[in-house]
Amino acid sequence: METLKRPIKKSHNPMISEDCIKYLQYRIQQEDLSSRIYLSMSMWLNNEGYTGAAKLWLAYSKEEATHADWSRTYLLSMGVTPETASLEKQPTSYIGLPQIIRDSFDHEIAITKQIKDMATDAMKKGDHMLYELCLRYLKEQVEEHDKTQTWVDKLAAFGEDKVGLRFLDNEMGGD
């Protein structure tokens, strides 16, 4: 009987720097964290009757998980096994939809700062591969910021009373 041979293991690509690996591991953790934050918000919104907003925040959660997969896929293509970091438990209750909108906006600002700092560091070190990846994330952050800024602006325009929040919820759900 012929013994099964182990598949060929992909070698570590020397083009990827240790800084790049560390950053991408961190990026995976942060994108997974963002996904879990938005998932937690979505579940709370759903239980509070904000079905439109719940649907939107669930879509945000899935989008963030996709962003984590960008880095995972890249690391795997370079022969590096991505780490699966443990993440802290997320809140299960919120003050209301206005808090979720503002918290999401603040969260996206913090994520953008992380990515900008890493892009600056990559430029200084001449790590062109890492810089290119940072640019991909920064382009995505322009969209993320625009989305959350739109909801902050609409919250200010429509108000935080029940009628204004119901209108926002309907708009978030595409109704």
Walk through the language-model features, giving the residues of each.
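Iron-associated oxidoreductase/ferritin-like identity signal
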Residues: 1-175
